[in-house]
Amino acid sequence: MKVAVLDLGSLFAKIFKLSTASPAVSSHPGGAAATGSVDSGASTSLREAETLTLLPSLPPDTAASREPFTPVHTPLPASHPRSSAAAQRVEATGCSGSLPSSSGASIAPPLTPYSGSAGSVASVTLPSPGVDWATLPSVTIPLGSNSVTASSPRNPRQLRAPGEREPSVWMAPGPVPKTLFFTLPDIGEEWTSDSDSQDDPEGRGLSEGLRKQSSEKSKDPLPTNFTRNVQKAIDKFASESPSSFSSSGSRTPTEAHNSWPGSSTQSSTTGLSTERSSVSSWRDDEFDKVSAQKVHQLFWEVEELLFEGKVSPQTQNLLAECSEWARRSLHLRVVGRQLVPPTDEGFQHFQGSLPSSATHEALPHVPDHTSSSRELCISGSQIVPEVHSASALTDPDGTESADLTSCSSLKEEVYHVDGNIEEYFAFDRKQDGDEHLGQSPALRGRKRHRHGLPPISPDDCIRDAVAAEVFDHVWTNVVEILEDLIRKTWESALTGGKKHKEKLKVAENRSPHVLMSRLSTDVCSVPPSRSSDTLQPSLAPHFNPPQFPQLHRFSSNFYSDLSGVMTIQAKPLQQRPTYSADRTQNDQDDKLPGGGVGASSRHRLGRILDARGPQTSVKKTPVHRRLPSIASDPQRLKTPTVYSDEILRGTKLQTGIDYLPSPAAVQTSRSRLPPIGSETGEPNTAASGSRPVSYRGRHPQSRVFSAMPDSIERSPLRERTIVLEQLSRPSTTHTFRSDTPRKGSLTPVEFVAHTWTGQSILTGSQYLPKSYQRATLTARKRFQVAS
């Protein structure tokens, strides 16, 4: 099919060359001759023409008659066996020389001619014997044509020139066989994709603007399956927009030649769109622009008249009016009072006193600045409107006027009272030397009674700046003068400091033991600490003797070296024989089996219960407020944990009536827990009965006593039963519960003890409730739990 189209194209090219060689071709004998005329414009218009067909356009010097255009349609016989396929192919490609679709097809309407001066149709002859002649129209459209009748697919109605006829079928005279008259369909998007001709690469597609100027057919005689794709493309690009019509409903004449892809294509949005540059919005915008330009030009001319003195024809009338006002009102002034406070930034209104007189009186010039006040100065004369005389006339409209003859003194008259305008400036002036000394006391008093003016003025700011500059200059001179004296003072202070330092070194070398003994006695009165801050109160009297207070101050500020400032030396260990003996006794008590544990625990319990009364006086001793030694920290840290090489052993506590009948019952009501002291045995001292209670500081009881709440021992039978029921639960917080009676009977010493052993209670409580889950109260059962 493509080969057939190419052959037709080459054949038409050859025929076109023959037709251009001879303007008139004679008819073949026995055949019908058809001649056509080319309505061409001037040679310049033909040069600008662009053909819409595959055939090359006519040259400018083509000889053609200047007759009016007549559409010529000569029938073509259906002699080709594959005419149907050829016709469909040529329709898709848009070739003007397409063959008829079938031999028995119906008659189609003719090609709609183009109206205009530049539209031309080239009539080409087919010198083939035995067949009819056909005309191949070649429509030429000049670029940049201003014709308002150019058709577009958006225009449903063609705008025809006056005197132009409707297109009709034109039949050649003579006998003709049964033929098909057809028109070329509108070209869609498929034209470029289906045409693969390499002979005319520039004609593969039409621009969007030229497609819109193609002819519009009244009917579509072809089947819908042939024109479906083309019609979709036409409907897509030729859809109408409501903004393209004017208010009257008819198309505006400027829409045809002003339509361009950006304005004629319908967007996906609905309704009116101002961004499509419709005629109405464009018109309104243009009117606004013109009005704005006129107003801007008027203001510009007024500014030139006022500031530059340039007179333009537009401001000539304004200048004449201003001159008339100046000629008639030589002494026109605006007087009145300030009623509306100013809102401009930097301006403030200060209410003055009411005018006491109604005459035009110029106040004497009095300087505003006095020696005792700092305020702004208001310079000028006061103008007070004069009270009208009895001869003043009153107009019907309420405006007052006076006769010129009655005002022979040329006093100021008030023509009209309208508005509230007043403007004055406050400024700061220089202080005159002795100008205010010769003034009368009345004028001085008048200035002192003026209130409401701001106290700070630019003159005061200048004075402060000058005073600051003078002070800086004087201070610089003072420092230069005192520089030598300050240097000598520093040298003497440094020399005295060095001498004092040497004396201290000699004193330390001579009696180091005496100094350390004094330090140890002072340190014992305060709690020891690992930091060196606690030694500062005791070291200060030794390194800062009262006889050298000033020298030490100078030496600490101006020392250039740090030798002797920080001294590192060995600290003597503090001996605590009482505490070590108590700790040894505790370790021995914890390691005693059976009766030894019960005896020591009973003795410790009795001692704590007896110490409730005098515990206040015991804590007043400074020795009892000392912190525990560092050596006992490892044993205290090991207290919450159970040793891995030991076995936790315990006995069931006695409850009920047989609980605590004698001191021996305390021994059976306690279970064995890991000891606090070291694992190695230490000799037991005989002074355990006389050791004080408060040496335990924060842990007065052993773990055996701290693991059991002592409320069981002191509470009645009813309370003890409740506590036992609570201990039967697998809870780890029963010791610190708020609903137990222990909280009310807890003493400060016992609270400190349980604070230190609280973790051991929580750790060992998971094993303790197992001994209380038995129903028998008198049975004793030993259990072993491995850590």
Swiss-Prot record:
Q: Where is the composition biased (Polar residues)?
A: 37-46, 144-155, 251-261
- Residues annotated as region Disordered? 22-105, 144-175, 189-226, 238-284, 432-455, 573-602, 665-697
Which stretches does UniProt call biased (Basic and acidic residues)?
201-220
Compositional bias, Low complexity, is annotated for: 51-65, 96-105, 239-250, 262-274
Superkingdom of the organism of origin? Eukaryota
- Listed Acidic residues bias regions: 189-200
| Cross-referenced Pfam families | DUF3719
* InterPro entries in the cross-refs: DUF3719, FAM149
Describe the family membership recorded for this protein in Swiss-Prot or TrEMBL.
Answer: Belongs to the FAM149 family.
Q: This protein is called what?
A: Protein FAM149A
Gene (name only)? Fam149a
